[in-house]
UniProtKB/Swiss-Prot annotation:
It is found in: Membrane. One of its GO terms (molecular function) is olfactory receptor activity. Its main location: membrane. The lineage of its organism: Eukaryota, Metazoa, Ecdysozoa, Nematoda, Chromadorea. Belongs to the nematode receptor-like protein sra family. InterPro entries: 7TM_GPCR_serpentine_rcpt_Sra (IPR000344), Nematode_rcpt-like_serp_alpha (IPR051080). GO terms for biological process: detection of chemical stimulus involved in sensory perception. GO terms for cellular component: membrane. It is a multi-pass membrane protein. The chain crosses the membrane at residues 22-42, 57-77, 104-124, 143-163, 189-209, 238-258, 274-294. Keywords: Membrane, Transmembrane, Transmembrane helix. It comes from the Eukaryota. This is Serpentine receptor class alpha-1.
């Protein structure tokens, strides 16, 4: 590691501030929670859900990206916190060369881009499962593998594209920061992430709307409804998860982009204070297993309650028919 210069006063104040320490503390809680909830969620996906094979494949890959990000984010943020607590008298040791940061930043971007692309990928998969009438297990498995492979390739390639032709000769305060000469490409990535965030939201709403129309159109076709039951349930759950993650991804992509594009117009101390909280990817990663677990549990309890109500109540023929119809409508 080469020490070209010492950290600036603004950088020292940032890393040693209680604002940053509290942000790191909150982030570590979210990271630990993500690890625990991810294990539970993956187990539930295979034991308590009726997700189709393609959905399960993409969801598992999404969990991999989320936890890759959380692991690398924990290393980088704790390293920064360590400097701000124990190395205040050695600020010449703070700065890191861009080459030394390459692996850390690249892995971090694999996690970020993987989560974003996986959201788009799983919505494409849900649209395909909803629209395609003969969505067999073999086709489902093939679709899941193709989409997951494409997302993996794009995730690995993202940071390589950002730093292409960059000599990596500068220094950075931490490995959160992309290489200096690649700042414009990093901003382009944030803009693409912002667009994809809105596309995912609109797609979620559109697929949910079509899902409801499909459910209504086949409500009296018992055989067809049974065949589509898994697709209807899976689609609704996935869309709810994607829509819930919209806010955190919007804050990250738009917030970081706005701050980076206006660095010359604001104080560096203000920039550091804001960027600490605008970076919300770790909370987006936490929301993924949390909401998925909630949706799986809520749907299972709702179905169980409906079945118990039907089997325990004394009803007229009309009431019994109406309750069965209502039970079929639950996704």
């Amino acid at each position: 590691m080469s020490n070209i210069t010492s950290a600036s006063a603004a950088q020292i104040d940032h890393a040693s501030s209680w604002n940053f320490r509290f942000a790191v503390f909150c982030s570590q809680l979210s990271i630990i929670s993500t690890f625990i909830l991810s294990v539970i969620a993956v187990k539930w996906i295979f034991t308590k859900s009726t997700f189709q094979t393609s959905t399960k494949i993409i969801l598992v890959f999404n969990f991999v990206y989320a936890n890759i990000h959380q692991f690398m984010y924990a290393i980088i943020s704790l390293g920064m916190a360590y400097k701000g607590i124990f190395l205040l008298d050695e600020t010449c040791e703070w700065l890191i060369t861009e080459k030394d940061c390459l692996l850390y930043t690249e892995v971090l971007y694999v996690g970020i881009s993987g989560m974003i692309y996986s959201q788009t990928g799983i919505l494409i998969e849900r649209a395909f499962a909803t629209l395609y009438r003969n969505y067999t297990a073999k086709i489902s498995r093939l679709v899941g593998i193709i989409i997951s492979t494409f997302v993996l390739i794009m995730s690995i390639a993202t940071y390589q594209i950002i730093i292409s032709d960059d000599p990596l000769e500068g220094v950075v305060l931490s490995c959160f920061v992309p290489a200096q000469h690649s700042a414009q490409r990093a901003n382009t990535f944030l803009f693409i992430a912002l667009i994809l965030t809105f596309v995912n939201l609109i797609s979620s709403a559109a697929v949910m709307f079509y899902n409801k129309r499909l459910e209504y159109s086949i409500r009296y076709k018992v055989r067809e409804r049974f065949k589509k039951r898994e697709a209807i349930y899976s689609t609704h759950t996935i869309c709810v998860v994607c829509m819930a993650q919209f806010v955190t991804m919007l804050v990250y992509s738009s917030g970081v982009l706005i701050l980076r594009c206006n660095m010359s117009n604001i104080l560096l101390t203000t920039f550091y204070k804001l960027i600490t909280w605008v970076y919300t990817v770790q909370y987006n990663a936490l929301l993924f297993p949390l909401i998925l677990i909630f949706r799986i549990r809520a749907t299972k309890l709702s179905r169980t309650k409906k079945i118990q109500d039907i089997t325990s109540a004394n009803q007229s023929q009309t009431e019994h028919y109406n309750q069965i119809t209502s039970a079929w409508k639950i996704t």
